[in-house]
Amino acid sequence: MLASKLDPFLKRFEELNSLLSSSDILNDISKMTTLSKEQKNLEPIVLKAKEYLKTLDNIEENKALLNDPELGELAKEELKTLEELKPKLEEEIKILLLPKDPNDERNIFLEIRAGTGGDEASLFVGDLVKAYARYAENRGYKLEIVSSSEGSVGGFKEIIMLVKGTGAYSRLKYEGGTHRVQRVPQTESQGRVHTSAITVAVMPEVDDIEIEINPNDLKVDVMRSSGHGGQSVNTTDSAVRITHIPTGIVVVNQDGKSQHKNKESAMKVLKARLYEMQESERLAKESEARKSQVGSGDRSERIRTYNFPQNRISDHRINLTLYRLDAIMQDGLFDEIIEPLITHHQAQALQEQNL
């Protein structure tokens, strides 16, 4: 019974209230912060649990009044409303009971690279960057370009962006994979549709404490920054290339004005990549059911097609097709795709958890 599953959460919440109101905890800032965070995480399910248990009590009370000559009709109406509310609350609680992705509240790095299709792929990277920027603005996130390499006719060969905001990872993690674009290039005189592809890698931003890097494992090179077409954009050796020797991961950053800033940004990206590598290894060891969840983030997985002549956008993971490509790209309306992905993910997770 669902009610019995809620009891431990209610007890723990009361226990946390007592602990946080004790005088001992005031002298231990670290413990107080940890307990406050746990309390905040429990609050949504506790509030919903109390509403659900109150609804169950009200149902029983109204059932007892059905034969009452004065209150019977009123109880019947009230019971109908409560019986409709009960399954809705149960579904909301089941979703709240699902295991949380520990990265969901983090900021997220988006690493976008042009793949097959040459210049057309680079141009689409540029278009997608603009669309993501509008999406970030819509949700109140901040977007920073960490590093970039421009395409020869515009757009980007590759770009790394950091999207900052509570829950940024929980939504944009579904963008990881291969994105295919079909459209007529401006240089195409015959009106033929060309197909190109780009890849998006998603990585949560991590703290220094979570990823420790031995300085002896790093090879740091400095060089002159190069601009569009390879020309030097300044006269100082401000560009930084960091190689993580054990894994072979290489990060180059030249977008900042100082060597220090570029090295700092490159280290953030390196830590995110190492964390992503560790997470991928951890997930690979888990059950096939766990791995089947939507959005593995594997950049080799073809997740979406953008067909401009048909104004169509299709997400292949959930067989979703919308004929609103222009609006989604122009206004950054990616929630029209992300929301169904989240719903699908939750449905799969509920099945796996037998909730």
Curated annotation (Swiss-Prot):
Residues 280-291 have a biased composition (Basic and acidic residues). SUPFAM superfamilies: Release factor. It comes from Campylobacter jejuni subsp. jejuni serotype O:23/36 (strain 81-176). This is Peptide chain release factor 1. Peptide chain release factor 1 directs the termination of translation in response to the peptide chain termination codons UAG and UAA. The lineage of its organism: Bacteria, Pseudomonadati, Campylobacterota, Epsilonproteobacteria, Campylobacterales. The keyword Chaperone does not apply. The gene is prfA. Pfam families: PCRF, RF-1. GO terms for cellular component: cytoplasm. NCBIfam families: prfA (TIGR00019), PRK00591.1 (NF001859). Its main location: cytoplasm. The modification N5-methylglutamine is found at residue 231.
